[in-house]
Amino acid sequence: MDFWSALQAIILGVVEGLTEFLPISSTGHQIIVADLINFGGERAMAFNIIIQLGAILAVVWEFRRKIFDVVLGLPTQAPARRFTANLLIAFFPAVVLGVLFADLIHEYLFNPITVAAALVVGGVIMLWAERRQHRIEVDHVDEMSWHHALKIGFVQCLAMIPGTSRSGSTIIGGLLFGLSRKAATEFSFFLAMPTMVGAAVYSGYKYRELFQPGDLPVFALGFVVSFIFAMIAVRGLLKFIANHSYAVFAWYRIAFGLLILATWEFGWVDWSTAHG
């Protein structure tokens, strides 16, 4: 593992870890940063699968007590069964649409200009959702009904468009559908587990020939870095939302998206042939 490969792994691991669970689109940031540091092709596809697993492991670790309680409670406790059912219901739409359209979306939409547009549009929607008065029906994830879960599951599918943000779509969707900010955020974290693991397993099997033994040190470094920074992001976000809205993330999305569009419009960076 040479110095440049290690540096690329660290940079992309940091980006994945910090952005995966913030409502600012990890995929969008990965596409932009990978293009800037010239990390692309088949190796990048395999690497992205690994660092996503690092990020999701951070959430599993952070919520290990809740996961343990749910697993133990499945045979005898109705709240544990309801919570599990809600996760499966919310997960299902992404499975169906992902299998049907993932390749087409990756081929035509995985580029910096699409990311920039989605960042701006998503930021505007986020500002509108935060300023809109909405009645809180659900204070805790255990109080959710199946129809809350299903609606959030459909909204999550919007995140197939790079730049939209999986966490952003599910959190804002949760707010619009009556969840408290804490409940929407926590359910987004829990929903990430089956969604991201499922996507990683599917992609890992589909592109299994891309994994080469020689890449193991670089992939392991990216995995560890992603795990560490995802832990920082998850804990930081849970503390942040206790006293703040998501407006700061909305303004960041808008500013970052406009910056990308400006570099394209004025020819400062050639995004026309960029790919994730």
UniProtKB/Swiss-Prot annotation:
Domain of life of the source: Bacteria
Keyword Hydrolase: yes
GO BP term (any one): regulation of cell shape
InterPro entries per UniProt: UppP
Topology with respect to the bilayer: Multi-pass membrane protein
UniProt-recorded Gene Ontology molecular function terms: undecaprenyl-diphosphatase activity
EC number of this enzyme: 3.6.1.27
Keywords in alphabetical order: Antibiotic resistance, Cell inner membrane, Cell membrane, Cell shape, Cell wall biogenesis/degradation, Hydrolase, Membrane, Peptidoglycan synthesis, Transmembrane, Transmembrane helix
Keyword Transmembrane helix: yes
Residues annotated as transmembrane: 43-63, 85-105, 109-129, 183-203, 214-234, 248-268
Function recorded in the entry: Catalyzes the dephosphorylation of undecaprenyl diphosphate (UPP). Confers resistance to bacitracin.
PANTHER family with a match to the protein in the record: UNDECAPRENYL-DIPHOSPHATASE
Other remarks in the entry: Bacitracin is thought to be involved in the inhibition of peptidoglycan synthesis by sequestering undecaprenyl diphosphate, thereby reducing the pool of lipid carrier available.
Protein name: Undecaprenyl-diphosphatase
Species the sequence originates in: Pseudomonas entomophila (strain L48)
